[in-house]
Every structure is written in structure tokens, then in C-alpha cells.
Amino acid sequence: TIDYKIEVINKLYILIDKVKKLIYSKLEVLSIDETLDYIIKNKCSVSRFGDGELKLIDNNGIFFQESSQELSSRLKEVIKSENNNHIVCIPDVFDRLDNYSEEPYKHWELHIAKTRKKWYAVLNKNKKYYNAFISRCYYAYKDKKNCEKWFEKLKEIWGNKDIVIIEGKKSRLGIGNDLFNNTKSIKRILCPEKNAFNNYNKILEEAKKIDKS
């Protein structure tokens, strides 16, 4: 059957990647604690990259954003940034996966098996990267005991601050939970839920109107 053939092909990808992993240099991805501590201490800008962003870099669309050469170029520019006040967060999935829950384990095992070469093409093996799972810890890890601590640290980033959330119209980030209950104030700039990058300049102009004093 087709499903059986796909399963065999996927297992072959994973087997081949076990060999590739021995050849490719190990990437340094810091822990969630190290990532959050660094952000809190340095008040830096943060960019998170995952499988969706890699698809867009590769000029392939995802569910809520069509591909474009301009978007691909801009994402490459960001992931390769050497700005001292900016960190790049990537999934900590290039070496070991045994600490992840079953579903994320299977997802990332196959994803990396198929895309390791593409990731390494845009990453610098001599650079220190930070952990993209700072906001996904509850989903990713088998051991959930640190999740509450991590979320409290995450909330320190915007604690007692006036914040602006730029989001899709239907995202409703933080509504119905206490994620932002420690902020001084919240403003929202609502964007199209699909293909928001097509309105990049309009969104940027709205963001520029916000008083940053």
C-alpha cells in the first residue's frame, strides 16, 4: 500500500540520517534555562525558527503564509544575523531526542532526517544558538516538572512592562489565561491571519506609531 511505502521510505531517511549525524559538526543549542536567563539579563531581541520557517526559507509555503523570494531572503538575513543584541533560537533536535515526548520525538526525528542538510546550509557551526522551545516546553518534553518554572521565567521578560502584541486577528495570544497578567499594559496590532507578510509595510507603519518612550 501507499502508506506502507511511505513508512519504509521514512525509515530509510531516518537510518541514513544516523550516518549523516556522525559526519556533520555538532551544533551548540543552549538549554531553556540558559536561553531564558540570557534574554532576561540582556533584554535582547529574539527570533525563533522552526520547521515552518525553514520551509519558508526554502521558498515553500506553509498553512498560513504563502512563499515568496523576498520572505525567504529576509528570513535568511535574520537567521544569519550577527547583531550583538539579537539571538537566534532553533529547535534543540539535531543531536539527541530521547528527552522528548512520543509525538514530538517522531515529528522531529523525521523532520531532521529530511532537512538536516538544509538547516546546516543556513546555520553556522561555530555560532552559539538558543532554544526555540522556550514557549513549547509543555508540548516537547517527557518530563514536565520544569515547565511551571520555565513559564514563570518566560513571564519575567515582559513583567511590569507596557507591551505591544502584533498578531493574527484570530490568535488571541494570552486571552483566557494568565500569560500576560503581570504586564503593566497591553496593546494589540491585529494582522491578517493568513499571508501577513504580504502586508509587511503596513504592519511596520502601525508598529512605528507606538510610543516607545
Q: Residue ranges of each PLM-predicted region?
A:
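Accessory, usually C-terminal, subdomains that scaffold auxiliary metal cofactors
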Residues: 185-213
